[in-house]
């Protein structure tokens, strides 16, 4: 049965979506926490192999406000690993396709998009009302700049390390940057962040040896 026939006009005009789409989640975490998610604002930098799945998961979890930052358009080579990439979205801006997916999941969500590269000389102004930042950027210098800004504004942030050229998903861990090992990107980041006085950073990284990977501060990170 088409979705339009499953809900009444009264449901469409009320808060049907938050009460029903996230009703199973409410059973798990409680109404108060569902409301917290609804009021939260998450900024995701980099809507690629990592960031696109982060956005999808957060939307389905009930996050109510998003800031999406990425300058890329979807390419045919993205289809094998990015959830926003299909034959119908090739050539479209990643941030706009991600926004459309969010609103298809939760029409009540608020989404601000920035089709820009986040770099030290081209920063998106962050505000204190951001609840959390997800760093899924693929350039080391940009990652460092974002982490520094989040630290200065006291905004919680989690950073994705290298995910490309790896095959074993069970090797991924959430850890502080200074407790990481094996990951070439994490090694570079530890050095750069230590030099800048950053004392801690939550990261997602893999202990799997990459098939082939060389990282320095000017490289893009496969993902």
Per-segment meaning from a language model:
Residues 12-19, 38, 126-132, 137-145, ...:
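Glycine-rich phosphate/adenylate-binding loop
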Residues 15-42:
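N-terminal charged helix/coil linker that caps or initiates catalytic domains
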Residues 45-46, 69:
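Conserved N-terminal Rossmann-fold NAD(P)-binding element of oxidoreductases
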Residues 50:
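Hydrophobic/small residue at the entry helix of a nucleotide-binding pocket
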Residues 60-65:
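Conserved S-adenosyl-L-methionine
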Residues 70-106:
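Glycine-rich phosphate-binding loop and adjoining beta1-alpha1-beta2 segment
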Residues 115-122:
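Conserved SAM/SAH-binding loop
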